[in-house]
Amino acid sequence: MRASPPAHSLLWLLVLLFAAPWASAQPAEPNAPPPPRNLIVLIPDGFGPTSQTMAREYLHEIEGRELVLDRILSGAVRTYASDSRVTDSAASATAYASGVKTYNGAIGLDATRAPVATILEAAEARGMATGLVATSRITHATPAAFAAHVPQRGMELDIAAQMLDQGIEVILGGGRPFFLPTDTNTDYAGRRDDGRDLVEEARERGYAVALDRAGFNAFSAIPLGGADTAPPVLGLFSDSHLAYEIDRDPSKEPSLAEMASFALAHLSTDPNGFFLMIEGSRIDHAGHGNDPVGHLHDIIAFDEAVAGALAFAEQDGETLIVVMADHETGGLSLGRNLDGRGIYDWRPDVLAQATRSVEGMLALVDEGMAPDTLMATRGGIVDLTDDERSALRDAVGVIRGPGSLYSVMAAILSERALIGWTTGGHTAVAVNLHSYGPHAERFAGVMQNDAIGRTLADVMGFDLDALTAELRAELRQEPETVVE
């Protein structure tokens, strides 16, 4: 059963206006294969080519298995934004979702701040089921770019409202407070000061809602049988981002692979096909923090979600999978020679000893554990040098910067593993492209990120230009919704 947004919803009007039969899509080239029935886009945020090498070699050497992503590696993506050679997630995800380059920070707008339709909106207009799954707040930049239109990515309260109005069938991630009012009577804090309770509004529209792990487990009882019988679902499992995979408490939060598997089972019952975006969000966050442990294990968790999607597509035969990061984060290198020691190597075995991310270890420091003890028991570094112990002691109480406890812990782990980082931000490095299924050959070689978006629309037969024109016309007719 599809959600029923209010009549005043601009984006719901788009669905009504542009709902059309399959035959109304853009005409195919003579003898071209039919469009895929289903489309799965997977985005490992902040995942560069070196990240893929790190995970590949770690899995091969430490766990004796291969990286699933390597099976479908097909090319590379240039990621620059309209206003910078180094993109952010908002601009790059907008390029993937809408086929246009835009400025850093933009969500669903072009470089002139005019709204542009997305492939999710096109899928909804066709009557397909749609889903968004992320380990970040679901209102964060990447998922937002597929379902909202705002001038700055930080407008997460607006993004949450627009996302709900889209009628998306599966929404799973973190970010509860952006859906709840500040005066909420629930056990969870809210950040909405407009009085709206989007969780309650979702229930009124027919959504099954989960705000914790128990609620997610209850989703398994939902009857599956197509859009007319299966209710849409909204799952918000954290106040902010979900935990890094290596820190995750399975009794409190589902994994990315679990959420992706549920989304596939739920959406695949729709007779009109589905669109699903899955983001491994926290790969990027660990890159920003130069945390090799968090980075590595979230890549592996993402690869498990890819494995599930690939198994589905292999059996289904009508599903296109496209995988690419929005950008690289951290300037990661495998091999480190900043101290003149001349060691040409890197050590995945060091990372294998760690059982917590740096963020996870800091949480235990807040509970009273000593940093040097944590580095031994959770970081796996049992032979700290005097210099390392001194750096840890000096960093206690330092919140930010190179001398913070986070930075010192991350640096010790990286140095021991002979891993280097060049930045705490993003880089301009081209990211790897992966594809499988019908029309996968069109996602190969070196492509621009906006070309990815246009090609996705083309192979699916979506007319984004027509939807964009209608979106802008509707905005002109409803001044209160104009993007400023």
Give each language-model segment a name.
Residues A23-P30:
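Boundary at the C-terminal end of the N-terminal hydrophobic targeting segment
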Residues T130-V133:
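Short hydrophobic alpha-helical runs that function as membrane-insertion/retention elements
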Residues G108-A117, V150-G154:
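Glycine-rich anion/phosphate-binding loops
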Residues P36-L39, F47-Q52, E57-T94, Y103, ...:
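A post-motif C-terminal structural segment
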Residues M1-P6:
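N-terminal secretory signal peptides that target proteins for export/translocation
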